[in-house]
C-alpha cells in the first residue's frame, strides 16, 4: 500500500501556483466561474499530458476511474468531458501560453551551456494539417455535413 505522496502531486508541487494565479488575474480567467477554475483546468490537462492520454474523454474517464484518489493527486473534483471541453473553448488560451513561456524562461538557464546537436534530415519533411471550416448552409447547399450544418474539410500540406 502506498504510504507516501503520489508522483503526480510531487510534480505538481514544482509548479508555481502563485505565478499561475498572477497570469490568470491579468487575463481575468476566473471571471464568473463557480467551481471549475483555471487551476483545476490546468491540473486536469497536465494530468492528461503526463499520462499520455489522447483526448479529453480519455482524461475524464481516467480521472473518474480514480475518483477516490483525486484529492491526493491535487485535483479538486472530477468534471465531465463536456465541462472540460467548454472550458477549453471559452477560456483565453493566452493564460496557458503565458504560463508556458514563464516555465520555459524558468528552465532556460539550466540548458544554456548544453550543446545543441547538429540535426540533419536527409529526406524532405512535410506537415499535414486537416481543418474543418464552418460555412453557412444557406449559401453552400452542397457543403452540408453532419447535423445539417455546412462545412468544408481542407487539407494543407506544408514543406
Predicted regions and their residues:
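Conserved, well-structured functional cores that handle cations and Mg-NTP chemistry
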Residues: 1-159
Amino acid at each position: 500500500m502506498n504510504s507516501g505522496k503520489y508522483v503526480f502531486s510531487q510534480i505538481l508541487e514544482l509548479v508555481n501556483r502563485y505565478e499561475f494565479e498572477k497570469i490568470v488575474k491579468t487575463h481575468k480567467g476566473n471571471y464568473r466561474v463557480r467551481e471549475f477554475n483555471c487551476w483545476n483546468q490546468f491540473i486536469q490537462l497536465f494530468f492528461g499530458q503526463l499520462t499520455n492520454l489522447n483526448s479529453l474523454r480519455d482524461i475524464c474517464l481516467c480521472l473518474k476511474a480514480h475518483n477516490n484518489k483525486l484529492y491526493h493527486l491535487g485535483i479538486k473534483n472530477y468534471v465531465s468531458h463536456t465541462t472540460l471541453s467548454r472550458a477549453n473553448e471559452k477560456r483565453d488560451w493566452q493564460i496557458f501560453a503565458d504560463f508556458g513561456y514563464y516555465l520555459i524562461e524558468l528552465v532556460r538557464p539550466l540548458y544554456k551551456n548544453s550543446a545543441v546537436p547538429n540535426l540533419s534530415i536527409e529526406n524532405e519533411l512535410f506537415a499535414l494539417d486537416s481543418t474543418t471550416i464552418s460555412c453557412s448552409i444557406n449559401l453552400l447547399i452542397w457543403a452540408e455535413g453532419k447535423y445539417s450544418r455546412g462545412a468544408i474539410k481542407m487539407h494543407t500540406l506544408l514543406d
